[in-house]
């Protein structure tokens, strides 16, 4: 049997949830990239690309929502440290015929990583796209939200395989 209390940093020796103490960790440059897809009808993608959505510029709204969400991650995820982010970028790329790819990059000089901020940015950007387009396509699917890479800190560099970075079907 695996002792998960030893493997999971947010669980103490009694099995209770806790916020990890990072005060002794050195300040280093931390960067994370996450991505996700919103799969939709081809007509919905055309509407977004043409800027014809009734609620306005879908991609601009989703970018801003993703950036705002990254900045609020510590408020949304209970055991996540509140961080002063030095940079957040969210890009949204239409991928013919039926999806958009969202990529978020988060950066800070700090004692803990920014993976949750990047993942939160992608998630909220995807939800914003869904919200703005649901009147014409309730069957949209938010899919494959994953950490693409992270660097900085004791655990070093992580990179998902390059083939997972492209706009592609499952």
UniProtKB/Swiss-Prot annotation:
Null mutant phenotype: Grows normally in liquid culture, traffics into host (human and mouse) acidified compartments early after phagocytosis, suggesting it no longer arrests phagosome maturation as well as wild-type, impaired growth in mouse macrophages.
Record-level Gene Ontology MF annotations: cyclic pyranopterin monophosphate synthase activity
GO biological process terms, semicolon-separated: Mo-molybdopterin cofactor biosynthetic process; symbiont-mediated suppression of host innate immune response
Catalysed reactions, semicolon-separated: (8S)-3',8-cyclo-7,8-dihydroguanosine 5'-triphosphate = cyclic pyranopterin phosphate + diphosphate
Binding site for substrate: 79-81, 116-117
Organism placement in taxonomy: Bacteria, Bacillati, Actinomycetota, Actinomycetes, Mycobacteriales
Gene Ontology CC entries for this record: extracellular region
Induction cue: Expression is positively regulated by the transcriptional regulator MoaR1.
Protein's recorded name: Cyclic pyranopterin monophosphate synthase 1
Pathway(s) served: Cofactor biosynthesis; molybdopterin biosynthesis
Keywords: Lyase, Molybdenum cofactor biosynthesis
InterPro entries on file: MoaC (IPR023045), MoaC_bact/euk (IPR047594), MoaC_sf (IPR036522), MoCo_biosynth_MoaA/MoaC (IPR050105), Mopterin_CF_biosynth-C_dom (IPR002820)
Family: Belongs to the MoaC family.
Coiled-coil positions: none
Assigned EC number: 4.6.1.17
Native species: Mycobacterium tuberculosis (strain ATCC 25618 / H37Rv)
Subunit-structure text: Homohexamer; trimer of dimers.
Main function: Catalyzes the conversion of (8S)-3',8-cyclo-7,8-dihydroguanosine 5'-triphosphate to cyclic pyranopterin monophosphate (cPMP). Probably plays a role in host phagosome maturation arrest.
UniProt-annotated catalytic positions: 131
Transmembrane residue ranges: none
């Amino acid at each position: 049997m695996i002792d998960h209390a030893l493997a999971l940093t947010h669980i103490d020796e009694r099995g209770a949830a806790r916020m990890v103490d990072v005060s002794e960790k050195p300040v280093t440059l931390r960067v994370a990239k996450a991505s996700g897809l919103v799969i939709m009808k081809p007509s919905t993608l055309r509407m977004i690309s043409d800027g014809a959505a009734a609620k306005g510029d879908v991609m601009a709204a989703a970018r801003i929502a993703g950036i705002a969400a990254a900045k609020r991650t510590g408020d949304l995820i209970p055991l996540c440290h509140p961080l002063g982010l030095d940079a957040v970028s969210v890009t949204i790329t239409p991928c013919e015929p039926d999806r958009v790819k969202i990529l978020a990059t988060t950066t800070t000089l700090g004692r803990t990583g920014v993976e949750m901020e990047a993942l939160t940015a992608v998630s909220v950007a995807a939800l914003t796209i869904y919200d703005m387009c649901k009147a014409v396509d309730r069957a949209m699917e938010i899919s494959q939200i994953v950490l693409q890479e992270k660097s900085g800190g004791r655990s070093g560099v992580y990179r998902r395989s390059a083939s997972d970075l492209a706009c592609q079907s499952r």
